[in-house]
């Protein structure tokens, strides 16, 4: 009996020795990514799940927040709860001044595959994704300029075939459709989230009006007056409640109003997030003041990823960024209709027949990237808020414009005098080719 017990003890001890020699499963490094994009949520989630299943060392945790994105990030940094990676929808200078973000140039320069796929070293836009030699994010694609999305059935019911070329005709179209809707449907709808930017500001752009005078290096809002006057007429006949952007998208998809303005992300929104099934919808260029194109429509390099300095596992975070911008990931993203390609490498590899409604947002020959306007320490409302307040009748139009010219230029001059920024001047600036001029930075 004693021999049996001794043998059993010996076997158990041997088993314990063997088990203790087996290494414990290492805990995954969790990399948290904050995004303010919801239109691509399904694709991002599926690809993140694929990554997490294939990797036993890194796990990606995505959090989507669409409200107050930049402030939420800064608060999280201050509170010690910051994510590791964020989407690019922030003001770069603010994040750099806050010492919040990491220069990715060393990672990029050491990775030839990443350079090949993203063309990262040639997609540096001063003040937008890069400052000097530092690169803080690399665009995966580009968002088109604003288009007019429209309900074909409501237009046809009021006798219209498409979107007119002039702002005056556009206003009259909205008025007639609202009148014909008799309180059930409306000609146009505006969101409470940056409404000026989504239509009227871009109509001004293609009319040659921009808020920064690149040739003379100063702010000038004077050209917006006719667009504000037209805006008052549009608001008077619009759907009467300006709600958040997703609520207004849902109402457009339900047929509540006929005219909506936004960029190429709406291809995914109205296919996946709020699929339109009850009517046919069209996409058209924004009208200009007189029907002529006198300025470029702004496109936005996008879907970039910034690494926060608070990240404790920067090499792991870089692996996640590399995955998000890998060939497989980006080809699927573009074919899913979530964005437009920004590099020839990806453009040549996507099957454009799979892009769905994104094809309706193919770039126009007058779309371009604008040089980033210097970020200033402004007191009071920004120009988009104030100009919309003028449209809503909360301020006189002339007074609103005069106040903006005064406040913006005073703040600009002050920041330059203190050495915070330099004056941006492009003497050979061409509004139809805004990125083609020679940039000069002045100390006064």
Predicted regions and their residues:
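Extracytoplasmic/periplasmic solute-binding protein
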Residues: 129-141, 146, 168-217, 257
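Extracytoplasmic "Venus flytrap"/periplasmic binding protein-like
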Residues: 50-120, 153-165, 251, 256-259, ...
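A structural signal for short loop-to-beta-strand junctions that line the ligand-binding cleft
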Residues: 75, 84, 113-154, 293-297, ...
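C-terminal capping/gating helix-and-loop segments adjacent to ligand/active sites or protein-protein/ligand interfaces
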Residues: 130, 139, 299, 359-414
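Glycine-centered hinge/linker elements that transmit conformational signals in sensory
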Residues: 173-176, 213-242, 286-289
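Long, aromatic- and glycine/proline-rich binding clefts that accommodate carbohydrate-like moieties
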Residues: 120-121, 281-288, 334-391, 421-444
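Short, well-ordered beta-strand elements
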Residues: 27-38, 58-63, 85, 136, ...
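Hinge/lid segment of periplasmic solute-binding proteins
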Residues: 90-145, 282-286, 441-444
